[in-house]
Amino acid sequence: VLKRAEEEIRFIEDHGIRPLFYQDEDYPQRLSHCDDSPIMLYYKGNADLNADRVVAIVGTRNITDYGKANCEQLVKDLSDDNVLVVSGLAYGVDAVAHRSSVKYGIPTVGVMGCGMQTVYPSDNRDLAEEMLQNGGLLTECMSGSQPDRENFPRRNRIIAGMSDAVVVVESALKGGSLITAEL
């Protein structure tokens, strides 16, 4: 156990990751009010996780052209406000929300369902790098944690818990987006 802890500390230090503990000033305060908030988060980036307004934008991975246009317009409309956009760095709505935030200069944070060593899906690796310039990446998963199915509902509770509002751009009748909105 001690060896694993030493490896984790080394990984954090080598990759510029900040551990945020539940009572730290930089820990997302909205999330700290949730009964199931994580004791610790791993954060890499420069966005204020306690911005005046935090808006989660979520939705289907299979976004339509109509959904893309609506998502981009929503983000553009938020660009005049002091807002942080949060999403899950997945395909579809999440990626459009993050890309649009980068485009309009809005801080955006991707909450991941795996450790910081992996960007999932890997197609979003370049997007994740861009987000580090004005935003960041956040996870409760230790290094080495893979993007396993059970991690995504836990990720979704962080997205909802740290946000003032959850906007579902486009979704199937059943799925993670509507579950996130209900949280």
Describe the residue ranges of each PLM region.
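Glycine-biased, small-residue-rich flexible motifs in mid-sequence functional cores and linkers
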Residues: 13-183
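Long amphipathic alpha-helical segments
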Residues: 1-12
